[in-house]
A protein has these predicted regions:
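Short cysteine clusters
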Residues: 37
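Active-site phosphate-binding/coordination module
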Residues: 40
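Conserved glycine-rich cofactor-binding loop
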Residues: 161
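Glycine-rich beta-strand-centered segment in the early N-terminal region that forms part
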Residues: 18-34, 48-90, 123-125
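Residues that mark the start of a beta-strand
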Residues: 2, 26-28, 154
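NAD(P)H dinucleotide-binding glycine-rich loop of Rossmann-like/cofactor-binding domains
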Residues: 87-158
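Extracellular beta-rich ligand/substrate-recognition surface
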Residues: 4-12
Length: 162
């Protein structure tokens, strides 16, 4: 499969790497639409020491919508072809690499996949080009919740991301 590998400041390589194989507890997803995050731009321009969770040598990208392509023998809560959003913080079971889960790769292997934890179902009413923006949407929602608005109040979130 083809994958964008983050090598450091202004250095991304497109490589042919083996397609991951699904273990008993894993789910393999095929990316269908990805977007470029402000974090992607920041670490590309300024390097890995920007404070973002990025792994040099890791598969780049984290804003994506995907389809389930393979399911491990012990996994029962996903179906083949189901559209899913891989939650960057938990998709690889390594919170240090949330920005390098493989959004710009053909496939992502999600180890020990859990519904509504590492992978979230995406309703069909949301088009792919919008579904890949679930991650920045959740960031804005979290920011609004942290402001603890009360019923009837408004919350505005400003940002320069995607």
């Amino acid at each position: 499969m083809k994958a964008a590998i983050y090598m450091g400041k202004e250095d991304i390589e497109i490589r042919e790497i083996p397609t991951p194989e699904c273990g008993d507890d894993d789910v393999l997803i095929k990316n269908i639409y990805s977007s470029v995050c402000g974090t992607d731009v920041a670490v590309y321009l300024h390097g890995p020491n920007t404070g973002h969770r990025i792994t040099t040598g890791g598969e780049f990208g984290h804003e994506t919508v995907s389809r389930v392509a393979a399911i491990g023998k012990k996994v029962t809560d996903f179906t083949m072809g189901e559209r899913v959003y891989p939650y960057p913080r938990f998709a690889k079971n390594d919170t240090k690499r949330a920005g390098t889960i493989g959004g710009f790769s053909e496939y992502i292997l999600v180890p020990q996949a859990k519904r509504n934890h590492s992978l979230y179902p995406v309703p069909q009413v949301i088009p792919d080009r919008m579904a890949c923006l679930i991650e920045p949407f959740t960031v804005g929602c979290r920011a609004a919740r942290r402001g603890q608005p009360q019923a009837g109040e408004s919350a505005v979130v400003f940002g320069a991301g995607t």
